[in-house]
């Protein structure tokens, strides 16, 4: 989604890692 792209672009790799962890917690992956 646009949130992942925007967060990754604005905040950097740590944002992507955090987002990925969030998805794993909720089983979205």
Curated annotation (Swiss-Prot):
Q: Which domain of life is it from?
A: Eukaryota
Provide this UniProt record's keywords sorted from A to Z.
Amidation, Hormone, Neuropeptide, Secreted
One Pfam family hit: Galanin
Question: Does the record carry Secreted as a key word?
Answer: yes
A Gene Ontology biological process noted in the UniProt record is:
neuropeptide signaling pathway
An example of a Gene Ontology cellular component annotation for this protein is: extracellular space
The record's InterPro entries line, in alphabetical order, gives: Galanin, Galanin_pre
Keyword Nucleotide-binding tagged: no
Q: Which residues carry this modification: Alanine amide?
A: 29
Example GO molecular function term? Answer: galanin receptor binding
Locations listed in the record: Secreted
* Record function comment: Contracts smooth muscle of the gastrointestinal and genitourinary tract, regulates growth hormone release, modulates insulin release, and may be involved in the control of adrenal secretion.
- Family designation: Belongs to the galanin family.
What name does UniProt use for this protein? Galanin
Q: Which organism is it from?
A: Alligator mississippiensis
């Amino acid at each position: 989604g646009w949130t992942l792209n925007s967060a990754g672009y604005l905040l950097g790799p740590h944002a992507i890692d955090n987002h990925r962890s969030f998805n794993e917690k909720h089983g979205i992956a």
